[in-house]
Structures are given as structure tokens and as C-alpha cells.
């Protein structure tokens, strides 16, 4: 595989990638401070004034790939340069281990290409010896030279239980120097899935998976889908904001509001693929949004941006974040009369007019 990459304005390619990761982190943090529209606002769970269940007996555990997880939460993929990225990943790993959460790491392309691990080495598994950890590579790399060897390296470097392949065509299209070659990705993915000894999860990065795309991915053997719909971190906006070109910024600006909103995408994917393990992420602000997504058919709930500031601070801050999310989800179950997540699937849900 060739490791040739184009540098930008004379900056070495590795340094350019690391700088981009740090800029992504700063801009993602800025987005979290903004109020953004969420598709979850269109849904309302019906309140049950007579729950006939004790709050303390509600069970939030979920079965996933034959394993019972204590909570239905995924720490979704994040990014960052080598110093902050290492700190973020260490804090997330400690919290994931303490709570039994799935930890889905950010893209490992930088580590694979030798520009620094950013905390994505064996230390991660040492900090989280029993938590499910998922490695991560970009789909566009599968038609740019990456194959099963690189996928195995991504898995092995953190002793991962699964591999995420992320789909980010819009981000790449508006990013200076982004990957424009996407023809053949599905076939390359099918080849990889046949050869890799780990299950493969496919996720978008913030613009959603349609039912049609979901069916195509199911057809090549993908083990789970992460909707990652709009309403959360908007990568086209971030790429526009970091661009030095006024023309590029104007191109990116046209895609504000682009994408499939998470709840609608979950609902359509679940109808199209009744048995597919499904993760809802993208714009999940709190436990009530999580309850709506679970009611619509999600099995797990992912958060990235909302966890980011806590992850920069400490493992304890991450634990506090998920304690709040857990308590909100518990109360949503309680106030719909649901003793567990299976009963929540049957709660009354309406669309706001």
C-alpha cells in the first residue's frame, strides 16, 4: 500500500493531518455550545401517571452480540491531535471500564500511517480490560490502498472487539484535500468483512444512513449499523469553518441542515431491517432523546460531542455525564410505565403537530 499523501501549502502530510485533527476538536467543542435543531423535538412519549413500577427496579441492561451490557450507551468516535487525543482516550477508557460501556475510538488512520497513536495503543486496553472497544477506519481508505492488513493493525493496536468503518462523503467532498474516490467502497467492504476476524460496524459521521444504504450494507455482511444522523456534530460546517478559502466556505455553507435526522432514520432502518443491531447517534442531547430513539427501534445510543468537554477534563467528569444520562433515561422509562428497555419499545409515542 502506498503511504503517499499530499501536503497542503508545503506542510508535511503527517503534520497537516495532525493539525487538522486539532482544529476539528476545537471546532467540535464550539459547536457543542450552540443550540441546534434536533429531530427528536418532533416526537413525544406519552406520560403515564400510574406507572405501577418502582423506579429503583427498572432495568436498563441490553443484550448486544450475545453479551449483556449494563447500560445501552456507546461512547462514540472522537478525534483530536496527539496530546489532547491521548488524554481524551485515556479518560474515556477509564469511564468505559467503570460503567461497562462500549468505547468506539476515532479514526486510526493517523496511527496506521505512523504520525502518532494519540492514545490509541495497547495502553487503551490496559485502562479498559473488560469494556468492549471498537477500532475505526474510514471507508474511503478501502479504495485508496487499505485492506485487511491495515484493518487487522487497527484492531490489534488496541485489542479491539470490532471494527467501525465510517462513511463521511460530505465531509470529504467539502474538505480541502479530502478523499474524492468512493467508487468501489461497497465491494471493498464486502471483501474486508469476509477476511477480517472481527465484526464490522458501519456508521455515518453526522448525516444519517438511509434504509436503501442500510439494506446494501446488510447485504455485504455488516454486523451492525450506527445511524449517526444530523442534529449533532456537523462536519461540513466544521470543514467550512477551518477553510482558508472563501469559495470553499461558501460551498460548505450550502450544506447546513443537510442529512437525515436521527429519529426518522432509526425508524426507517428498523422497518427495513427488523433484525439488524442498530445504534442511534447524532443529536442525542439527553436521556429523553435516548428513550425516543430506543422506542423507535435503536438497540444502543451513541454520544460523542456531548461527552467531549467532560472527556477533556477527567474520567470522573465522563462518569458524571453518563450518570446524568442514565438517570434521565430511568425517569423516562418510569414515566412511561416501562420496567425495562423491551417494555419501552411498546410505550406510546406521537409526532408533534
How would you label these PLM feature ranges?
Residues 1-65, 69:
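An N-cap/entry alpha-helix motif that binds or orients negatively charged groups
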Residues 183-313:
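Glycine-rich phosphate/ribose-binding loops and adjacent secondary-structure elements
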Residues 63-114:
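Active-site cofactor/substrate anionic-group-binding motifs, chiefly glycine-
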Residues 98-139:
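A gly/proline- and charged-residue-enriched helix-loop-helix capping module
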Residues 2-29, 295, 301, 307-353:
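C-terminal extensions of enzymes
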Residues 75, 96, 163, 225, ...:
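Conserved, mostly hydrophobic/aromatic
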Residues 73-76, 101-106, 133-137, 161, ...:
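Hydrophobic faces of well-ordered beta-strands that scaffold small-molecule active sites
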Residues 147-213:
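Metal-dependent enolase-superfamily TIM-barrel catalytic cores that perform enediolate-based chemistry
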Amino acid at each position: 500500500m502506498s503511504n503517499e499523501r499530499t501536503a497542503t501549502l508545503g506542510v508535511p502530510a503527517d503534520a497537516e493531518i495532525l493539525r487538522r485533527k486539532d482544529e476539528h476538536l476545537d471546532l467540535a467543542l464550539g459547536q457543542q455550545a450552540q443550540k441546534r435543531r434536533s429531530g427528536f423535538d418532533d416526537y413525544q412519549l406519552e406520560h403515564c401517571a400510574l406507572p405501577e413500577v418502582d423506579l429503583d427496579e427498572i432495568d436498563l441492561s441490553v443484550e448486544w452480540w450475545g453479551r449483556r451490557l449494563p447500560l445501552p450507551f456507546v461512547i462514540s468516535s472522537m478525534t483530536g491531535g496527539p496530546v489532547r487525543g491521548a488524554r481524551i482516550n485515556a479518560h474515556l477508557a477509564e469511564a468505559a471500564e467503570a460503567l461497562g460501556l462500549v468505547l468506539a475510538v476515532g479514526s486510526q488512520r493517523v496511527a496506521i500511517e505512523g504520525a502518532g497513536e494519540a492514545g490509541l495503543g495497547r495502553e487503551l486496553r490496559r485502562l479498559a480490560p473488560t469494556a468492549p472497544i471498537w477500532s475505526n477506519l474510514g471507508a474511503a481508505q478501502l479504495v485508496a490502498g487499505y485492506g485487511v492488513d491495515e484493518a487487522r493493525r487497527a484492531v490489534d493496536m488496541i485489542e479491539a472487539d470490532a471494527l467501525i468503518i465510517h462513511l463521511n462523503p460530505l465531509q470529504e467532498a467539502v474538505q480541502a484535500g479530502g478523499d474524492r474516490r468512493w467508487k468501489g467502497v461497497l465491494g471493498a467492504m464486502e471483501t474486508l468483512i469476509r477476511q477480517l476476524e472481527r465484526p464490522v460496524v458501519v456508521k455515518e459521521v453526522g448525516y444519517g444512513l438511509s434504509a436503501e444504504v442500510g439494506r446494501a450494507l446488510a447485504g455485504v455482511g455488516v454486523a451492525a449499523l450506527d445511524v449517526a444522523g444530523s442534529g449533532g456534530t456537523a462536519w461540513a460546517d466544521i470543514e467550512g469553518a477551518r477553510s482558508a478559502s472563501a469559495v470553499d466556505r461558501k460551498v460548505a455553507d450550502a450544506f447546513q441542515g443537510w442529512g437525515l435526522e436521527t429519529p426518522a432514520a432509526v425508524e426507517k432502518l428498523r422497518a427495513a431491517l427488523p433484525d439488524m443491531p442498530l445504534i442511534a447517534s447524532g443529536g442525542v442531547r439527553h436521556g429523553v432523546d435516548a428513550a425516543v430513539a430506543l422506542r423507535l427501534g435503536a438497540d444502543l445510543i451513541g454520544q460523542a460531542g456531548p461527552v467531549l468537554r467532560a472527556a477533556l477534563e477527567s474520567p470522573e467528569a465522563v462518569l458524571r455525564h453518563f450518570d446524568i444520562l442514565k438517570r434521565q433515561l430511568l425517569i423516562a422509562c418510569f414515566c412511561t410505565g416501562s420496567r425495562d428497555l423491551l417494555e419501552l419499545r411498546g410505550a406510546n409515542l406521537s409526532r408533534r403537530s
